[in-house]
Structure formats: structure tokens, C-alpha cells
């Protein structure tokens, strides 16, 4: 399945959850906020079962006003990434971590620690800006009826 189809499936799942929640709908919390992290999880090859934990640790790690929570989230995230990298080393999957591991053979150019840093960087750097763009896009659709209609006609 292509990345586009996998992302579309994630979006459909989140929109279904938004619909099930009924009014009032919280688009930000249900769709915009989780979507970027879930897509990065897809890119990294994180299993569906582990995604909620990974997303929670990412949120916890950013709790700068609660150092113990941030430290715990970061430690959990780091442990998980180490385990994931080790698992990917032998799995032969089609994801970014597997590609980085394959590129490092037979002469490792990247250490496991560097691969974990790259994965964490994608997770953190790819989150807040994308959430803001999704939220802004929804605001523009809600405030510009002609654009909303154009999207309905040609999704």
C-alpha cells in the first residue's frame, strides 16, 4: 500500500472518530493534533498497537512545566526507539528506520543512537507546524463558504 493510501486510511479513521463523538466536535483534538504523529509513526514503521503509547510519550516529553513528566516521557520514548531499531534490524520492513539500517550495512555510517535521534526529530519537528497548518486550513474552510463548496464538488 502506498504512503498516500496509508495516510488516507489514517485520516478516514480519525474523521470516523470525530463523527462518532457527535456535537460539539473537537477537530483539533480528534484530527489535527494526532494526525502528524500518526503519519510519522507510519513512516517509522511503528505498529498500530504501539502508536498510542508513542504519541503519549511525545506529548509528555514536551511538558516543560512538569520536568518529571517530561523526563519520564522522553525516557519511555527513547527506550521504545531503541527496541524498535533492534527489531527493525532483522525484519526487513519498508520504512525509514529499516532504510537507514540497510544503508548502514556493511559499514555502519549511522549508529543506533543517531538513528533514534533522527526518528525522534521527525516525531517532534514534524508535529507542531503540521498541526497548525491543519487547524488553519479548517478555519479557512469554515470561514470561506465558496472554498468549502469547491472542496465538496472536487475533493
Residues covered by each model-derived region:
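Cytochrome P450
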Residues: 1-155
Amino acid at each position: 500500500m502506498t504512503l498516500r493510501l496509508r495516510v488516507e486510511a489514517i485520516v478516514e479513521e480519525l474523521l470516523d472518530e470525530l463523527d462518532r463523538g457527535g456535537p460539539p466536535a473537537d477537530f483539533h483534538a480528534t484530527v489535527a493534533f494526532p494526525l502528524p504523529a500518526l503519519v510519522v509513526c507510519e513512516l517509522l514503521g511503528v505498529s498500530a498497537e504501539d502508536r498510542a503509547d508513542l504519541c503519549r510519550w511525545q506529548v509528555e516529553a514536551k511538558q516543560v512545566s512538569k520536568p518529571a513528566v517530561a523526563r519520564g516521557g522522553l525516557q519511555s520514548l527513547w527506550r521504545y526507539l531503541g527496541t524498535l531499531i533492534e527489531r527493525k534490524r532483522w525484519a526487513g520492513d519498508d520504512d525509514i528506520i529499516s532504510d537507514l539500517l540497510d544503508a548502514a550495512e556493511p559499514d555502519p555510517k549511522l549508529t543506533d543512537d543517531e538513528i533514534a535521534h533522527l526518528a525522534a526529530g521527525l516525531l517532534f519537528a514534524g508535529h507542531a507546524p503540521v498541526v497548525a497548518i491543519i487547524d488553519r486550513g479548517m478555519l479557512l474552510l469554515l470561514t470561506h463558504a465558496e472554498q468549502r463548496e469547491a472542496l465538496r464538488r472536487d475533493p
